[in-house]
Amino acid sequence: GDQPIRTPGDLRHHTLIHDETLIRHWPGSSGWSEWLALAGVPEFDYSAGLHFDHSDHCVDAAIAGSGVVLGRRSMSSRDLEQGRLIAPFDLDLPFRGGIYSVTTPVKAANPNVQAFRRWLREEASGMELNSPRS
């Protein structure tokens, strides 16, 4: 839309970009429904808009100015830093995904495997589902 986004409620005047991958692969996430409720936005029909099956397509659409997307910082941090995207609100959904490291008991004792698992835990501890990007 042509209207500025000053409050979360202003999103009703803009095209929302839906990441179907997010909804399928992040248990308990309903995407926009959950974020809008967290932001205290009265219900409206947010189902219209653009729907993509790949998160990177959602981000690309937002960069092209096609709408507003919920995205992960891990995918959009460079675009945010370089000004191709902005985060209009400081409101993040909690991370609900899981990351699993599976190996055999013998290989679990390998120092390289232990180092990898420590690194994976450190990386995963900073993951979150992010606020909208426009």
Segments (PLM) and residue ranges:
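Short amphipathic alpha-helical coupling segments at ligand-binding clamshell hinges
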Residues: A108-E122, E128
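C-terminal regulatory
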Residues: G1-S66, G71-R96, E123-S134
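A bilobed periplasmic-binding-protein/Venus flytrap-type ligand-binding module shared by bacterial periplasmic
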Residues: I99-A109
